Regions:
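Conserved phosphate-binding elements of NTP-dependent enzyme cores
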Residues: 1-956
Length: 956
């Protein structure tokens, strides 16, 4: 009998306090609780990790070494576990070859559709391409200049791996003498060794002819032989000219040929179909002249060319070579670059048009003479950028580069042959330019012949269902060519969700991390319906979520708490939603019932009368909109997913401000004009990226409080006696740290096909410092003891140290009292990292001219955490600064001073300003989707506020 519940006993991962619970299987289960309470530790680090570990354990030792091991979570027993799949918030891929189409596998089905039912059209004459007859091929070749030396070849292997020894042997037996392998002609009598792991092109040389009228018959026979050898393909070469003939597909007027239609022809990741200039990326990188020569009014000697700025007039070999080039073209090094002639600038950028004799002296005093072309600075940087293997050098060259659409394919990624094939009225690239909704409509109205319809039936069904799944999870505005790396965490997660639904698996345990993030309230119902459909297929869903609508729609809620960090890790409630609401000590239940809420501010701020006004913004889908950002207010930018919020704030507003403040490399999105930038002197972006990439980074080092703590220890009597300065108390430098583990506290032992093992350092026993350093104490505690304290404990410990206390207080105020000062930054959640950054900003003296930008800051935050976040944002605005937030969370939106609502829909149907004003004004707007849901939120808040305290609404 199948077990109907998931049994967990003795879970102690991270902050979990030996918890035991039963969760029903094949249900939609929501895990909730404060940020840092232990939800993720239970859902991902315990349940999913154990499911993954059991799968990996079932594989052979050989397979395990490629997968990397999975540690056994700290839990006594888990029973009733299904195969587990995790769908988390991580963005899909930053690989420029990864698109929405490839991630969802829709593009794979499209390639199949175009290969089996596509019709090639000549790009020059717009007529369908049909196979050429041998007579037509002969006529084409006979039109070439008489006396041409022809080589007729059969392309038998194209871009395939193998050593092909048997192939060469058969060709020898058949009497052939020569083959062309990877562009090089070889004799078959010689031993030809090929790397079987590399892809090769092999052409058999069928005949060599001098073109005359009397050789027509021989040409006909040779072409016939080549066509039979290479499945209807033949290559005729003369000098630099090489033409591919096909009895399959070629234009009868100009001879434009298309290879046999197969799926890989339509892949921009395969050499057969990819554009040969950009290799399928759609973009090329070249030197940005504005970056290379930022100020043309400067001369070369004044550092006008940034690349040579620091080596002008030195013995550097690069400078000696460049100075020779300048001398050859009579370039005056003291003349402004803008006054040089076109010929001189061309030589500086692209190099000499003739060999130049010159000599250079090495640093060792040796003299070398050369007579060669000298490379220009632009050509030099572009060549080295491609050739260098040093990441540091590549980074340096990259500072001069900018991306532009490929000059050959125009950003379409594919070669002319692949783009010539159409289904209906579109080639495969123009299909990917459509949004999900447009693509669905196009497929529904696609007209095919009876044969084509029969072939395409199954493929179209797969494409249609996958597009429908994307629409169901609220992503109907995405285009299939959208780069996966440009998706938000929520979008990426919902794409993976759509892919999973498309696989129609059952009996699986899905663990999801806040799928509602980045989704407008309007689209929430569709997402919930999707999750229920997955459950109804016979799957178990565990969803880490804070969205109230999702919680109320769940079959079961597990509430972890009561607080965060050391104050959490317990099961507060475990049952249906109504049971959680009735649980007195459940903070989640109190917010669901309305006993606790986020109140409305007592009044909406009037601002400081200044604003930043943008006119004619038209980046991505923005429709030449005019937007006013009032300063000195809490400004919310809202709208359905894909309406253009991130484009307006991050691409246009933020980059325009950064450029005005001197960030040279930043290129703002397109707009006509902007005014009011003089009212801002600083911009701070507070995102959810980690505060550090290494385990050495922690909240104490990031906020700067660790410097002050080290000052305190350096001032202790013992430290003074020993002559220790503050550097002695750093675990990053030699002196005070334990050298056995270099201040890490642990050692990593590689176990080959087993996971790496982390063992405490046997010298310092995990304490990071050497014994002498730890002997210096302050109030009975050494530096390691302080790093092990929580923010809350440290506040009391350093009560008489105002500098330290102030910094710790800001961490406490943003709700991070439970964090250890020395907790590794890599273990912090996105929400925690963001609040550490906020705390760090709160410590700084307000300028009144600073603008803070936050993109969906409520990700990973419980309603109680959101309450704290709003209080912090209000504090920042109270000090005279401006905060601009992109957000869907109604609790944040209702507390705004000013809202800019975009829409009406996502993608092409968005990009317009629907409404601006206070929350009350937006709620009253008939065309605003945000307004409809905001009105309900405002009414609910007011009703519950009156019920609680007799009618007052106050600022938290």
């Amino acid at each position: 009998m199948e077990q109907d519940k998931l049994i967990i006993r003795g879970a102690r991962e991270n902050n979990l306090k030996n918890i035991s619970l039963d969760i029903p299987r094949n249900k939609l289960v929501v895990m909730t609780g404060l940020s840092g309470s232990g939800k993720t530790s239970l859902a991902f680090d315990t349940i999913y990790a154990e499911g993954q570990r059991r799968y990996v354990e079932s594989l052979s030792a050989y397979a395990r070494q490629f997968l990397g091991g999975v540690d056994k979570p700290n839990v006594e027993l888990i029973e009733g576990l299904s195969p587990a799949i995790s769908i988390d918030q991580k963005t899909t891929s930053n690989n420029p070859r990864s698109t929405v189409g490839t991630v969802t596998e829709i593009y794979d089905y499209l390639r199949l559709l175009y290969a089996r039912t596509g019709v090639p059209y000549c790009p020059n004459h717009n007529i369908p391409i049909t196979g050429q007859t041998i007579t037509e091929m002969v006529s084409t070749v006979m039109s070439w200049p008489e006396g041409s030396r022809l080589t007729i070849m059969a392309p038998i292997i194209r871009n395939k791996k193998g050593a092909y020894k048997d192939t060469f042997e058969k060709l020898r037996r058949d009497g052939y003498v020569r083959v062309r392998v990877d562009g090089e002609v070889k004799m078959l009598e010689d031993e030809i060794e090929l790397d079987k792991n590399r892809k090769h092109d092999i052409d058999v040389v069928v005949d060599r002819i001098i073109l005359r009228e009397e050789s027509r018959g021989r040409l006909h026979d040779s072409l016939e032989t080549a066509l039979s050898l290479a499945n209807g393909m033949a290559v005729v070469m003369t000098g630099d000219r090489e033409e591919l003939f096909s009895s399959n597909y070629a234009c009868r007027i100009c001879g434009f040929s298309v290879p046999k239609l197969e799926p890989r022809l339509f892949s921009f990741n395969a050499p057969l179909g990819a554009c040969d200039v950009c290799h399928g990326l759609g973009i090329t990188e070249e030197v940005d002249l504005d970056s290379l020569i930022p100020d043309p009014s400067k001369s070369i000697r004044q550092g006008g060319i940034r690349y040579y700025k620091n080596i002008v007039d030195t013995e550097n070999i690069e400078w000696q070579t460049f100075a020779t080039l300048c001398k050859a073209y009579k370039v005056d090094l003291d003349k402004p670059l803008k006054d040089l002639t076109k010929t001189q600038m061309h030589a500086i950028l692209y190099g000499s048009d003739r060999p130049i004799a010159y000599s250079i002296t090495s640093s060792g005093g040796n003299k070398y003479t050369r007579n060669d072309y000298i490379e220009g600075v632009k050509s030099l940087i572009e060549r080295r950028y491609v050739e260098t293997t040093s990441s540091m050098s590549k980074e340096w060259y990259h500072t001069f580069m900018f991306e532009s659409p490929c000059p050959k394919c125009g950003g379409r990624r594919l070669n002319e042959q692949a783009l010539s094939v159409r289904v209906g009225d579109r080639n495969i690239h123009s299909f990917t330019l459509m949004s999900v909704v447009q693509a669905l409509d196009w497929i529904d109205h696609l007209e095919l012949t009876e044969t084509q319809a029969q072939i395409a039936d199954m493929v179209l069904k797969e494409i249609r269902s996958r597009l429908q799944f994307l629409k169901d999870v609220g992503l109907e505005y995405l285009t299939l060519d959208r780069l996966a790396g440009t998706l938000s965490g929520g979008e990426a997660q919902r794409i993976r969700l759509a892919t999973q639904i498309g696989s129609h698996l059952s009996g699986v345990l899905y663990v999801l991390d806040e799928p509602s993030i980045g989704l407008h309230q309007r689209d929430n119902a569709r997402l919930i319906r999707t999750l229920k459909n997955m459950r109804d297929l016979g799957n178990s869903l565990i969803v880490v979520e804070h969205d109230e609508e999702t919680m109320m729609s769940a079959d079961w809620i597990v509430d972890i708490g009561p607080g965060a960090g050391i104050h959490g890790g317990e099961v507060i409630a475990n049952g249906p939603p109504e049971e959680v609401i009735a649980t007195e000590n459940s903070i989640t239940g109190q917010y669901l019932s309305g006993k606790q809420l986020i109140p409305l501010p007592a009044e909406r701020r009037k601002g400081n009368s200044h604003s930043v006004d943008i006119t004619g913004a038209e980046e991505h889908n923005l429709k030449k909109i005019n937007v006013k950002f009032p300063l000195g207010k809490l400004v919310l930018v809202t709208g359905v997913s894909g309406s253009g919020k991130s484009t307006l704030v991050n691409e246009v507003f933020m980059k325009a401000v950064q450029q005005n403040l001197g960030r040279a490399k930043v290129k703002p999105g397109k707009f006509k004009k902007i005014k009011g930038l003089e009212n801002l002197d600083k911009l701070v972006q507070i995102d959810q990226d980690p505060i550090g990439r290494t385990p050495r980074s922690n909240p104490a080092t990031y906020t700067g409080v660790f410097d002050d703590i080290r000052d305190v220890f350096a001032a202790t009597p013992e430290a003074k006696l020993r002559g220790y300065d503050k550097g002695r108390f750093s675990f990053n430098v030699k002196g005070g740290r334990c050298e056995a583990c270099q201040g890490d506290g642990v050692k990593v032992i590689s176990m080959n096909f087993l996971p790496d093992v982390y063992v405490p350092c046997e010298v310092c026993h995990g304490r990071r410092y050497n014994e002498e350093t730890l002997q210096c104490t302050f109030k009975g505690k050494n530096i390691y003891d302080v790093l092990e304290m929580t923010v809350e404990e440290a506040l009391g410990f350093f009560a008489n140290q105002p500098k330290i206390r102030t910094k710790l207080q800001t961490l406490y105020d943003v709700g991070l009292g439970y964090l250890k000062l020395g907790q590794s930054s890599t273990t912090l959640s996105g929400g925690e990292a963001q609040r550490v950054k906020l705390a760090s900003e709160l410590q700084k003296r307000p300028t009144g001219k600073t603008v803070y930008i936050l993109d969906e800051p409520t990700t990973g935050l419980h309603t109680d955490d959101v309450k704290r976040l709003i209080a912090v944002l209000q504090r920042i605005v109270d000090s005279g600064n401006t905060v601009i937030v992109i957000e869907h969370n109604l609790d944040v939106i209702k507390c705004a001073d000013w809202i800019i609502d975009l829409g009406p829909e996502g993608g092409d149907a968005g990009g317009q300003v629907i409404a601006v004003g206070t929350p009350e004004q937006i709620a009253a707007h008939p065309d605003s989707w945000t307004g409809q849901y905001l009105k309900k939120a405002l009414d609910w808040t007011r009703a519950h506020t009156r019920a609680e305290d007799g009618g007052t609404t106050c600022q938290d």
